[in-house]
Amino acid sequence: LDFAMAASYAAGRSDVMRHVYWSWGWARLALGAPREALAHWQNAARLHGGAPFWLPYTNAIGLWRMDQRELALAWFAAAVRSKPELATREGVEALATSWQDDERRTLEDVYEAWAAKPKG
């Protein structure tokens, strides 16, 4: 997908542009650019105008890929608070069913580190 062309098409339409940024973030992550992915996801969240359910776990994935493990775990804890099903392996697997293998593995790695960390 040509994201520059999609962004040009969506200009002035935040309802469309937020989807462009969200997808662009995943594409950048797939290309090994987690910092850029996070920036695109932040833009998508800003255009969303609220607290999108996907922001905590996508931030966790991007930060994990940047080796910012503690911050990634803090974001994953926020994801669990907003989506309690992510507190289980089954919930994580259900979320990532249609994801790419490396994306799913990253989420599983974050989950395993979070689950192993003492709570409280």
Annotated model-derived regions:
Residues 1, 38-39, 70-77, 104-111:
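Conserved positions within tetratricopeptide repeat
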Residues 2-53:
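Alpha-helical adaptor scaffolds
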Residues 11-16, 48-56, 81-95:
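Boundary/linker segments of alpha-helical solenoid repeat arrays
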Residues 26, 57-61:
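Residue-level recognition of tetratricopeptide repeat
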Residues 32, 66-68:
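Short helix-adjacent coil turns
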Residues 49, 68-70:
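Secondary-structure boundary elements
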Residues 61-65, 78-81:
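Short basic/hydrophobic patches in alpha-helices and adjacent helix-turn junctions
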Residues 78-120:
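Terminal, low-structured helical/coil segments at or just beyond the last alpha-helical repeat
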